[in-house]
Amino acid sequence: MERVWNPAAGIDGLKRSETYLVDPHDFVGVLTLSPYTVFERGLFVRMSGMRLLALLAAPKPQEPQPAVRRFPQRSRRNVCLKACADGAQSLAKVLAARVSMPPCMSKTMADLSSAPRGNMYRKRFEFNCYLANVITCTKCKTACLIGALLHFYRMDAKCVGEVTHLLIKAQDVYKPSNCAKMKKVTKLCPQASMCKGLNPICNF
């Protein structure tokens, strides 16, 4: 079965004989599409590992320049999640042990662990934004966080698209909703007045 390619992983682990689903937005100016191009799941193009390697080796166009990932200048918890990306360790268990998450994020993570899809978009968005703001890895440069989330979401195509957009393609780091909105609007705050600050990212 074909796998959704994670652009943050680069050529590491890429196998020529396997088939991958690739987001054409990752190869703007390199991959040529036509009216006859077949899109899998409405988002991806199927290609062999050999062709994907060739695309990665192809000269990149000078314009437009790819978006530069800009992280906010604030302290974050240095946690390597490579073992979670490989499936050797549970992301939920590692985060519970290494990060002091607020109740809203702990509950959201538990809910997503059971079922990442099914009216769960808001929870995925808030959880992804929270981790993007509080977790870093000086060794992997956030690639392990992306891989861990993809494994956590069971490589679901929609979830993969959301993660890659938020953590790779977006120019700015989105913040999760503030605590007031979490409580009154999205109803994701299970225990008010138990955290410091006005946003979940104040707690890690």
Curated annotation (Swiss-Prot):
Coiled coil: none annotated. It comes from the Viruses. InterPro entries: Lef-2. Keywords: Transcription, Transcription regulation. Pfam families: Baculo_LEF-2. GO terms for biological process: viral genome replication; viral transcription. The keyword ATP-binding does not apply. Belongs to the baculoviridae LEF-2 family. Required for late and very late gene expression. Specifically required for expression from the vp39 and polh promoters. This is Late expression factor 2. The lineage of its organism: Viruses, Viruses incertae sedis, Naldaviricetes, Lefavirales, Baculoviridae. The gene is LEF-2.
